[in-house]
Amino acid sequence: MSCSQERKSDFLIVKKDSLQYEGKSVELFKITNKQGMAIEVTNYGASLVFVSAPDKNGVFEPVVLGLDSLRHYLGRQPKLGATVGRFANRIKDAEFSLGKTVYHLDKNSKAHSIHGGVKGFNLQVFDVDTSYIV
């Protein structure tokens, strides 16, 4: 587990965890603003895994469902917080027409294609450059 911090304008960015998955580095970042609200995101599936916001009394509480560790997000988990794409929902018979062209997609839900196909965005490891976080 590695932990590094970087201040970007009004946010504190902390790399909380990092592990190797299929030859790539999967990382977990915590971003906290000056008011104390925090989110955690991972570059695996561009997933939002934690949000802490104040309640009516100003007490910060988690407000989204999440899994216990970064490792639990890998593979075919329930897609909690993941980015859906290149499309969401099912495409019947895994094909669609655009103009006069018929496009055939991966079948990953019986005869249909769902949530980006076999290797949708939720299963991608995205590159992270924290210099772009403002």
Segments predicted by a language model, with ranges:
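Surface-exposed acidic/polar loop and edge beta-strand patches at domain peripheries
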Residues: 4-134
